[in-house]
Amino acid sequence: MTIKVGDKIPSATLMEMQDGKPAPVSTDSFFGGKKVALFALPGAFTPTCSAKHVPGFVNSYDALKAKGVDAIACVSVNDAFVMGAWGKDQKADGKVHMLADGNGDFTRALGLEFDASKFGMGKRSQRYSMIVDNGVVKEVNVEEPGAFSVSSAEHILTEL
């Protein structure tokens, strides 16, 4: 079943590079007690993700904070080392938490996994964005395959 407005974010452990090492991030603690703009994408260093999706959230950091967002997070089915390197490449440090869902457990629990095997990428996350307030989904925007519009930072700003 796909996550929907009013659902609680599933409990899972993601990974984030901290002090040069992968560190576990509990979704319960990360999303608890704060408003989070969450977005996910099929893969680090892929064209749309690198040219539009991540830069949009990095560039909208101040606007999102001004609208009450406490944290911005990007999730992808990649390992923490790749997500950390990509975050540096995208100048996301200090603005967007680059969270690795290495085994896809969180993505699967959300019901937002898709099979990208025909591209040599295995199981990946669909492209989406959410507003999560104290662990509860307030808005969810899932893109059609190949599309990029409702998961953008610009769209999230209209929902706050």
In which residue ranges do the predicted regions lie?
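Chalcogenol-based redox active-site neighborhoods
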Residues: M1-L160
